[in-house]
A protein has these predicted regions:
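N-terminal auxiliary segments of SAM/dcSAM-dependent transferases
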Residues: 4-6, 11-136
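SAM-dependent Rossmann-like transferase core, predominantly class I methyltransferases
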Residues: 106-173
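A structural alpha-helix within SAM-dependent methyltransferase catalytic domains
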Residues: 29, 163, 191-194, 255, ...
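Nucleotide donor/acceptor-binding cores
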Residues: 70, 176-178, 266
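Conserved SAM/SAH cofactor-binding pocket of Class I
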Residues: 149, 153-235
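S-adenosylmethionine
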Residues: 206-309
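A structural signal for isolated positions on well-ordered beta-strands in alpha/beta enzyme cores
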Residues: 73, 100, 202, 226, ...
Length: 309
């Protein structure tokens, strides 16, 4: 079960005019990413409940360049985590931001975005939230996903691109032994791999809220797999397929470690990339001993499939 309380850290910009402030906001967002906050919300909470595209990562650009800066919100179950984050923000960005923490019930927080979470049908899977009880397609593998506080509901293009790449790889391989999902979020990709028949599946995430969400979804889907709170696993390599749906800011820093997890000749799927970042990502990957095999884009986002050289 999810914790009963959800906590909100709001980050308000004290000076909201001038192009230099937009640059500062991007710097702050990158700082959040570097601190492990890979997903957060821009704009008022009221707009979150009206706009189904509320899930915004640090690489997405501020849309209204001519207006004032919207606040940033970080949501966590762990109040102490947010208090530590606020202290670090105030230490690093004093006089430029104002931070505040408030609490609300998890039930009310989750009710706000339920209408925006719709079932997704892919080549092999039917992804749906637990509150939708419609008849499921007979020719698809059902996966029930409740996101909680974690990233990865199937609604975002990067998650769909990853899922499709996993399905395409499944159609071409007979090696279904070991699967690694780095930055597992809700566990959706790891669960899909287990449903396809992988013998051993490991999901990792640095976010404790993601581990809570993925554990619950694993139980809901009657799957057996390992979860580790952390980034790249130690002493677990190699894997037949490795997936990392994170963001470019992080991927370029860990690409060498990701490559080390992949069996020679096996595949690494990367997503969380903007289409404009793919060529630079390819350069980092090549230096890590990976060759680009395939690339797909959707809604300005991209997924890349690399083979370990």
């Amino acid at each position: 079960m999810h914790p009963t309380e959800t906590h909100q850290l709001s980050i308000e910009f004290t000076n909201s005019s001038g192009p230099q402030v937009l640059e500062f906001k991007e710097d702050l967002k990158n700082w959040l990413i570097g601190s492990g906050e890979e997903a957060f919300v821009e704009g008022a909470l009221d707009n979150l409940f009206e706009d189904p595209s509320y899930e915004i990562t640090a690489d997405e650009q501020f849309a209204d360049l001519g207006g004032g800066l919207q606040s940033i919100f970080v949501y966590k179950y762990d109040l102490e985590h947010l208090e530590r984050l606020r202290a670090e923000l105030e230490k690093n960005f004093a006089h430029q931001i104002k931070c505040d923490i408030t609490s609300l019930t998890t039930e009310s927080w989750m009710e706000g975005w339920k209408e925006s979470f719709k079932p997704i049908t892919s080549a092999r899977f039917y992804l749906y939230p637990p509150w939708i009880q419609d008849e499921k397609p007979a020719n698809r593998i059902p996966i029930v996903i409740e996101p909680g506080m974690a990233f990865g509901t199937g609604q975002h293009a990067t998650t769909v691109l990853c899922l499709e790449a996993i399905e395409q790889f499944f159609d071409k391989t007979t090696s279904l032994d070991r699967f690694l999902d780095v930055g597992t979020g809700t566990g959706i990709l790891a669960i899909a791999a287990k449903k396809l028949g992988y013998n051993y599946v490991l999901g990792t995430d640095i976010d404790s809220d993601a581990i809570i969400a993925s554990k619950e979804n694993i139980v809901q889907n009657n799957c057996k797999m390992d979860l580790v709170q952390g980034s790249i696993p130690v002493d677990q390599a190699p894997f037949d397929l490795v997936v990392a749906n994170i963001i470019f800011f992080v991927l370029k820093q860990i690409i060498g470690d990701l490559s080390a997890q992949v069996k020679p000749g096996a595949l690494l799927i990367l997503s969380g990339l903007l289409a404009e970042e793919t060529r630079e990502m390819e350069e980092y990957a090549l230096k890590a001993g990976l060759r680009l095999e395939k690339e797909e884009t959707r809604d300005d986002w991209a997924a890349q499939v690399y083979r370990k050289i």
